[in-house]
């Protein structure tokens, strides 16, 4: 029982640290999310461009380009998007994952969002770099 208590305390501390070390995406959004990197507080990924695409049957997605602006290879990077209706109510959030991104490397991402009726409701989105870590 004592071990469970220690585990819960440590888990709470880790979650708090991860939540504090956020990384905001480009495009002027305030969408902050967590990072798994304890080495630095500076986000090594910059979102260079992004836009919303609508397809048939209510499919929406965000595509764009990001870059590793750090000096280390990134083993894992998430680019996340949250989708909202016209009233600003969150519909859902989705992400795209990339692995082994070298320093200076640019990469394209495509975040497939809600589909069908939910996709038709999307009026706006925001985007950010999610979890990332280096070698």
Curated annotation (Swiss-Prot):
Transmembrane residue ranges: 4-24
Keywords for this protein: Membrane, Transmembrane, Transmembrane helix
InterPro entries to which the protein is assigned, alphabetical: FxLYD_dom (IPR047676)
Record's bilayer topology term: Single-pass membrane protein
GO cellular component terms, A-Z: membrane
Major subcellular site: membrane
The keyword Membrane appears for this protein: yes
Keyword Transmembrane: yes
Annotated localization: Membrane
Cross-referenced NCBIfam families: FxLYD_dom
Protein name: Uncharacterized protein MJ0360
Species the sequence originates in: Methanocaldococcus jannaschii (strain ATCC 43067 / DSM 2661 / JAL-1 / JCM 10045 / NBRC 100440) (Methanococcus jannaschii)
Lineage of the organism: Archaea, Methanobacteriati, Methanobacteriota, Methanomada group, Methanococci
